[in-house]
Amino acid sequence: MAHKGTESKEQIWPYKITIGICAMNRKATSKPMRAIMKKIIDFYGQWVDSFIFPEQVIINEPVENWPLCHCLVSFHSTEFPLEKAIAYVKLRNPYVINNLDRQYDLLDRRTVFKILSDNGIEHPRHGYVIRGRPNEPDTELVEHPDHIEVNGEVFNKPFVEKPISSEDHNVYIYYPSSVGGGSQRLFRKINNRSSWYSPKSEVRKEGSYIYEEFIPADGTDVKVYAVGPFYAHAEARKAPGLDGKVERDSDGKEVRYPVILSNKEKQIAKKIVLAFGQTVCGFDLLRANGKSYVCDVNGFSFVKTSTKYYEDTAKILGNQIVRHYAKSKNWRVPSDMPQPPILDLGLGDDPPMITTPSGKLAELRCVVAVIRHGDRTPKQKMKLIVTDQRFFALFEKYDGYKKHEIKMKKPNQLMEVLELARALVIEKQRDRHQILEKLREGTGEEEIHKSEHDLEVCEEEMKKWEQMRTVLEMYGHFSGINRKVQMKYLKERETKTSDEELRREGPALLLILKWGGELTTAGNMQAEALGRLFRTLYPGIRRTDGKSSPEDTQGLGFLRLHSTYRHDLKIYASDEGRVQTTAAAFAKGLLALEGELTPILMQMVKSANTDGLLDDDCQARLYQTELKRYLHKALQADRDFTPQDYLELNPNGLRAITAAMEFIKNPRKMCHEIAGYVEKMCGVIVEYSQTRPTGSTLYLQESMDLAQRRWNKELREFRRKNKHGEVEFDISKIPDIYDNIKYDMEHNPDLCINNEVEFERMYVCVKNMADIVVPQEYGIKTENKMVIAQRVCTPLLRKIRNDLHRCLENKESEETQTRLDPRASQGIATPFRHVRTRLYFTSESHIHTLMNLIRYGNLCSVDDKKWQRAMNFLSGVTEFNYMTQVVLMVYEDSRKENDEADTGPRFHIEILFSPGLYPCFLTEKERIYETRFNLSTNPKPATSSRSSGRESRDTNDSASSSTEGRRPSIEKVVTVVTPTQLSTPSVTNDDLSISSNAESTAAESTGLVNTTTKTHNDSEDDLNDVESVNLVALDELNNTTKAMADDGKTAKRQRSVTGAEKSMEEGDKPHGEWKGNGVAKSGSQISVGSNEMESNNESMETVGGGKGQWVKDLLDQTKRAMAMNSIREVEPPIVIPTPVPSTTTAVVEDEASERQSRSRRYFPYRFKHHTAQLLTGMSGGGVHMQNRLISTDVLTGKFGDHDNKKNSRKDFGAGTAVLSTAVIARSSSAPRLMTYESEDFSVGEIKRFWPPLRSLETLHDSINLSQFDGFLERLIKGALTPLPSPPKTPLPSALSCDAINKTPTQDEVEKVIGKLAPTSSTD
């Protein structure tokens, strides 16, 4: 025993184990290898030693001359002689860490997949194409536009094409035409690129490839590094196929973050290590659809930058080597040897608390948003009845007789239709030529008459086929997302001829071509900008050293949250191209991606239609059709709206609809006026096209002929004669006309350059009609709104409810969630933070129905003051424009065990809403300016007489005559701003009370200062939306004008002629006694005098190389205005009743025509809301630019609280907001938007930011989660409520006064005569 005790204190190992590193020099001396070997020596130095095989010896010397070692670490890489290493192992028989013979398996992707399959490891479905390989027969590949066939197996796009050899990293991903086609080409990283997008969609024709089914993994790749069967370290990175940009750290290494592996994935790692015989082995995981797929096995690889991984690996390998030799030599295992690690993946820490936008202290857990798509082109379609046998052959080719219709969107299908259209155009031209020959040669009157009729028919058909050809040839290529052809089978039928004879017609095809409705460039930029701004909803950056850091003004906190896999993001979109493209552009801005949208769309955006998530309900659509018929008749009455009409058409008393009805007065006369404007537009396009060079096109390459046909179709379908020969108007076409006029004024303003007065009036008239028609198509009475909304939104509500439940359950068993491993992370201050985000992009119908559920679903108590303010605010919203957002934010206060009455709920929800873009038209901008000019020192609130300019016009009055009569009085109205005073005439026609000082007005007009006070007549809960608008609207950014001159110059403000009452936008002052206040007319528009017009230099630039002299002047005057603020508040207002000729004021009436002509020259720019990133707030003595996304004005009652606004200039640094957002946020914790310096954008870029987005208004900030869950449950259960009978026709198109008085009310005619059977039985 004594001998043994003495021996235990002595060295029990006779010699050290030698580890030999046999690999190419760049691998053997890499940073990870050196770090790991150093750790092994540190931990096990008394038992092991190591050396590196010289590269020259490996390459040039025979294996007999290679140095000896006990343990060999060897692996294949480029130029490594694997066969010599295998021969060395056979010769010397060392202990091998990674099996060298099995490394050949890793070089062939076919073998890799076979081994995975044999071991039951999930992997993508795949097929092989072999070409030109010895001893292997070539396989067959058949390529189609949107799929391929490999040995009889079909792979639909998107699919992945990889070379058979694992050494070849040129991997291609092919996309379907439905998302734009093309391919993403991946390669070994070169500088900061790992892939690029190519428009080519054809697969490679040379070489051998493996084709895999594409697995969308939300733009994330997971790399797993296994060390032995019981240890695996996982890191995630941005997928190289997403945008191709490589994110690198300060050391030049690709940025990756450790993530948690599920138990199943750990088992996969164990299986791979054992199946491939590789102790150190890396492989790639794709997580999708609740599963994890192995798409590649890389063999020997180390983590690049993890110190903890180096230590763990050193202990595992060192322990394994020592124990192997101790066992093989019967040596004693050292008792003091370091033990291998067991990685703890527990999540024990509490998540960090943050301050919510409303001021509460809680942790953000979940964000759910429903967002409407961005700005689009007008949707269009044309119909043709065809009997040509070639179309029947096409119909049969695509199995049309099975369903009696076909839909064609694929490029090859559209090309077939295009070829037929081209052939038919040529044939019709030939037929026309022959008819003209007959006409010239004809002698008899009957023969000439017949030839003339045939010629007319032939030319009409030729025009239709030319239009179809033109539409199909637009853009020069087919993408599959912007055009669609349908063909429906029409059976044989009998028709009556003109002489009452029955004639049997054979079968025919109804050919329907649909185009338009695609996202515009502006819509793309709006979505991307909103994505960038959306980052600021999330927690900001927190420093790891505990020191304070600057406020996160660019959403960097979100980017870090997402890139470090503490953010679970899913984006869903309905199947319309504009919706999916909006979602992709939003994701691009949200995640700071680069490059084309197609790869982003394919990898980040999920189709919501696969499970009917955003589908429409069939019965709801039928019911809406009946509502359209009701509205069609109700808005045909040739009389002013009566009080009864207000009750029937607007039973909920929405301010926006009431204001629109007051504007319209007589709906039939308004329809006549609108029809006259549409007809005028048709003539304007013809005139415009005659003054332009041949081949000139409008926005997005729309030809003049297509634009003319677009408006002619609107006129033809809107104004038509019924079977009695009476003119009637199709009210259902009002939304289409509104889309068209809004689109042309936004994107084709040159069309209106000499007719701005008429088309301003047209826009306002059509908008007010649309403000009635569009929301009422989703229900008129509350019960109708609710039933339709439940039918449409139930699938979405179920999904949202499921999102909330899964977020709160926080199951660790979610296999597909890529989540940061907090135990292995470094340099992250809040590793336990985790946020779940679900974004749903959809069209207008889901927005309207969802908002109806929120309004009328009894979410909150009627006594809730916050909810009252929110409903008052929503009552004034006239439209849910492009990019409308409904956002739910779930917060948790982890300090509370459960919902307690005294401490409040553990989980609460904040509801935010934005109506999207500002209305794009000038009138809305003028209204903003008008309100800015009403100062706090004015003792009377601005009013407007409803009798002024509001009388119904005669049906026969033309648009021009109705405006000309008002011109002289308005042309005298001129507002002139000087550096010292603002002269404001008394405006009887507009009833505007305007007075100010120059500096304060300059600030106010740009949204920098708000000085409107609350009078004793105002209601406490008045919600004047205008007060929330802080918008810098710049005129003439194209080096033509500047809105503020230099200090010694005069900048003039002139009221432009609109000749029309303006529309009611939300909160346009009709609160309290609002029935007595009319809808104010179009007001001010910035223009300039001749001095400014002639100036054409860089001082007019708002941004760019000229450093923005305009901006500097504006900000200088703003600062002076603020400095003089206290003096201005006590001074009486300066009101000059009429313009007086002087050096600083007055515009003579004789100059009116010259000014009007001058304004017309610059008219295209006046129609755009040019917004600059001028975000003002005082930081010390200078100007600090900042911006905000969230407003709490509605929530706090500050929205319209003029007493609070009075001193707003004192709180100037609190953060006024411009660009995309509008409302002054009350809470200092509200997240701020991106900060832009003036040189960040060029003038051209700024001009494309219009119209701006409205801020997210906080509707409620303290809804208990259980309360909201109960609300959703009620709505989902009530979705099977049968639809009530639609309202019957309330009024004929024309009735006598007596008949009108006897007409029953809607309540009387809307008796339920039957119930539609529910689609399914209740539970």
From Swiss-Prot:
Q: Where is the composition biased (Polar residues)?
A: 933-947, 977-992
One example of a Gene Ontology biological process annotation: inositol metabolic process
**What is a single cellular component term in the Gene Ontology annotation?**
cytosol
In residue numbers, the region (Disordered) covers 933-1022, 1043-1107, 1134-1155
Residues the record lists as binding ATP: 109, 162, 169, 188, 212-215, 221-223, 284, 296-298
Q: What function does the entry list?
A: Bifunctional inositol kinase that acts in concert with the IP6K kinases to synthesize the diphosphate group-containing inositol pyrophosphates diphosphoinositol pentakisphosphate, PP-InsP5, and bis-diphosphoinositol tetrakisphosphate, (PP)2-InsP4. PP-InsP5 and (PP)2-InsP4, also respectively called InsP7 and InsP8, may regulate a variety of cellular processes, including apoptosis, vesicle trafficking, cytoskeletal dynamics, and exocytosis. Phosphorylates inositol hexakisphosphate (InsP6) at position 1 to produce PP-InsP5 which is in turn phosphorylated by IP6Ks to produce (PP)2-InsP4.
Spell out the family assignment given in the record's similarity comment: Belongs to the histidine acid phosphatase family. VIP1 subfamily.
What is the recorded name of this protein? Inositol hexakisphosphate and diphosphoinositol-pentakisphosphate kinase
Q: Which organism is it from?
A: Caenorhabditis elegans
